[in-house]
Amino acid sequence: YVQKFDAPNFKKFMADGAQAEALIPSFPSKTFPNHYTLVTGLVPGHHGLVDNAFYDRSSNTRYSMSDRSKVEDGYYYSGVPLWQLARQHGVKSASYFWVGSELKDESRRPDYYYLFNDTVAAQTKIAQVVSWLRLPEPERPHLITLYFSSPDHEGHDFGPNSAETRDAVLRADSVLGVLMTEIKSTKLPVNVILVSDHGMYEITVLAETTLFRDELINIKDPSVKYVNGGTQLHVYCSDANKRDSTYRVLKKSERNYTVYRKEEFPARWQYQHDRTGDILIEAHPGFYIRDVSRELFLKNAPLGAKRGVHGYDPEATPDVRGIFYAQGPNIKRGAKVPPFQNIHVYPLVAKILQLPLPPIDGKEEVLIGIYRT
């Protein structure tokens, strides 16, 4: 987006700091799994948020990012988020929206936090960040996480190459300009890291690019549970026989998707978790699994329209890769690194804050080249 839409404040930020060619999301390239990977240094298959929605066998519950009670329930979250690590070592933290920051358990939350509300204006968030930075030293957070949902919304609704997305990127660029001006006005030595949880892949809304859930599996079968994530469909079976028969049916009609049994998941996904489906239907890039029937889709869908999606395997689809830019007193100006997986952001932040690392998937050496003492 920065190069495509010529975003001046982002370009200045990059020129004054370090950058990666790309930030590779962890599988699946979805919002909740990757936000939580960024702050835990663990892949989704290890931290437990395996998708934006999933079924949890142990508790016989379904987690969904739109279900407040589940989002705030620490049961679903493993790992040690950066704010929890900070708290364990007497360092204050704050968050203006981040996945995992709203848990009911105070010991696992930032010292200052907000419940997610997508209507809060960017200016309001920036003003709060600056007021946190202006707190007296004993109360001041040394770690702040901040989330902006634009241009993600526009990318989804109009596709990554649309005028609407361009306008949203330029609005985000203005927000970055204001944020950096305000941070500089505090005269504090602040390191700023800009990341995205994923990129965006353009699809065309057509019956030909749609996989209909009810044509893939028997949704009336009580011995099968499923959770559809659009790019992936998780299928949970009551027993091994049911799994094998379901798999055979899916394998026979395999077209525009790949079907995997759990033990067949590519090793690079590191996706062996109780909460992933016994069977996973992985839509091929450009295709999308929908819950509606073909009939309803053809009646209501904006056929031919461009949309943006993510969730595909980042190894196979470079478009779903994200950004990593950083600047500040602990960042080498002008440093460039090749594409790297987002599990490696956590150890850099921990090093800047001088916090010891818990057991994680990320490795400190990946970004040590951009670190300045």
Regions found by a protein language model. Name each.
Residues 1-18:
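Active-site-proximal N-terminal segment of extracellular/periplasmic enzymes that hydrolyze or transfer
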Residues 122-134, 151-192, 349:
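A long, amphipathic alpha-helix that forms part
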Residues 16-20, 88-94, 138-144, 187-191, ...:
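Loop/turn elements at helix/coil->beta-strand transitions in domains of secreted/extracellular proteins
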Residues 226-336, 340-348:
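Active-site neighborhoods of enzymes that stabilize oxyanions during catalysis
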Residues 21-39, 97-103, 363-367:
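Short, solvent-exposed turn/loop segments enriched in Gly/Ser/Thr/Pro and often Arg
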Residues 41-159, 255:
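His/Asp/Glu-rich, glycine-adjacent segments
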Residues 189-190, 198-238:
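Acidic/histidine-rich catalytic neighborhood
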